[in-house]
């Protein structure tokens, strides 16, 4: 019995060994255990193995036919008998049977196993390529074992999002391969052991019809891709689906309607739930609450926390019948509603009164105006009935402009500044305490035809010299306004381009004055005005220069290398010789007629002279010709009849130039900047940046530390040289361009500005000896009296040498004296 059982076990094991051979054509097995055998031995072994496989197939087919023919009852009986026989086996016999089929070792195959397996199956080792070895390293890790032999340990599998966490095992392991790939094959996939899963048999059309009529239990009409059969659901799954559809709980164990258990009932118990003693904090005042209460008390005392006023229940509420609806919700404090459009007026009515209807002249005038200049966008019309009123054509445009107004003009809430207006006004002394200063016109000097452009007072203060567009130079008596001297400097009256631009009395040589007309500068000693000694001194001062020039002495120019760092070195020609610079002006002897009128010398420049100023010693004269480029500024010496240009390169259009009252400095004002040059050190000492667009004139304080500038952009700028290169004060009191500004040279703290608006502004300016105290500027008076002609007002102002008197020259052809 035992031997028959062992034989049956052998057959079963042999059948299990033979099963993988059926699919030998689907696997590529490479390499054998005996790698050193020759090719002939391999071929012989393959032939023997093929014969054994054929025999096994025949035996297997016979066995299967016999098993199919057996009855089910006989199979059950044999199975019970077989189970009983296995239980009767002793332990030693069972161990012998198991040892018979066990391996002899890990590395070698026992030859006895190959001998007993008469089917000729040979064990083969799988030899792997380099690519397969790399893939194997990603899955397993080879480490040395305890016996010193290599041991393969599989790496830990990390669950990711795509990992499957279901408990149901997949019978078909094709993965993501679609079932359509197996349409032409008899199987539909492979199981976990690599065996084919055969396609299930399909019924006929009649069977399918019967299935749709008599639906089996759990029928879904779906196809299971893993088995190819119909997918049916169980009763439990169907019940779960019904619960989900009814929004019920899926767990039968949970009851959402359990009975209420009153853990804490309304009945008062005698014994407490907890017998712990009361904590100390229950009967001691809280320190934190005391701090909060004190903060609230302080806030109430300071008025930050206000209590609600008590409402009188008997008081009757007052309502504003004209106010908006009180039940509306109040807007947020930061909400700003759009301003409402103005209500329509009487002229917008379809039947306005007659006085609101425009005349034909008014309609023509309205049509002639530009749309942006019209007061209203419609013309009032009258209709007999409202049904006759046509559609309003401007409605779309008005809505669009309304939208633009709301979009481009955002509403912003600004906090109101509670500032006392008096605190914004500087604390200045009263003008009455700063007397004297000019307040009225005392004398008017008439006689010029056209604009009066130049004005100057001699150092004695008795005579006034003026020049204008008529080309004449006139000398007036200050007190009486009588004309004492007249000299025509322009040959023809029709010469519109030439006019007397500047007139200046010599501060050191009495009786001598300089006047410019066009490109010429005239040195004049007016006859019959002064006594013989004064007149003779002035003529000798001019004539001694002719003798110096005739002596053949060379003129020594001022070294101007340091005045202009960017000077061009173009004075050398191609041969390397130094070119001799041509003088910026020529000295010409006047004719006999001109000498009879008092002209002692004529200086001819290259361009029109716009400004001239004397040095304090009276020997040097600086002139400005803006269109002469780098020769715009020229310095002329009277005693030597020499002229020189201190600059080799132009740094802007020069507007004015002056000597410092007592230092060897030259102030040059361009359109944007004022440069101060030190003539002794031959360097630029300072550069002022007034910030004006176009500087018109320049004047220096008698103390030499402050400068005022006038500009065409309606500003008067005060510069403190000890403070900064930026303006100390910017005064904007004029409505048009400021033409000229001047300090009082006689020691009075006064200065003024003249503008094209026809006004003269008088200011008080005190300069303190203390360097820590800023100058005090106080506006005093606005003098009005000149007329504006062709957009031009007052062109020039000049202070009296000693008195608080002011002289002005304007475009209306007159000069005026303003006194206290």
From Swiss-Prot:
Subcellular location per the Swiss-Prot or TrEMBL entry: Nucleus, Nucleolus; Nucleus, Nucleoplasm
SMART domains named among the record's database cross-references: BOP1NT, WD40
Keywords, sorted A to Z: Nucleus, Repeat, Ribosome biogenesis, rRNA processing, WD repeat
UniProt repeat feature WD, residue ranges: 447-486, 495-535, 604-646, 649-687, 690-729, 733-773, 789-820
Record field: compositional bias (Basic and acidic residues): 9-19, 53-64, 551-564
Cellular component GO terms held in the UniProt record: nucleoplasm; PeBoW complex; preribosome, large subunit precursor
Pfam families per UniProt: BOP1NT, WD40
One of the protein's GO biological processes: maturation of 5.8S rRNA from tricistronic rRNA transcript (SSU-rRNA, 5.8S rRNA, LSU-rRNA)
Disulfide bonds: none
InterPro entries for the chain: BOP1/Erb1, BOP1_N_dom, WD40/YVTN_repeat-like_dom_sf, WD40_repeat_CS, WD40_repeat_dom_sf, WD40_rpt
Chain residue ranges for the region called Required for interaction with YTM1: 395-431
GO function terms (MF aspect): ribonucleoprotein complex binding
Cited function: Component of the NOP7 complex, which is required for maturation of the 25S and 5.8S ribosomal RNAs and formation of the 60S ribosome.
Name listed for the protein in its UniProt record: Ribosome biogenesis protein ERB1
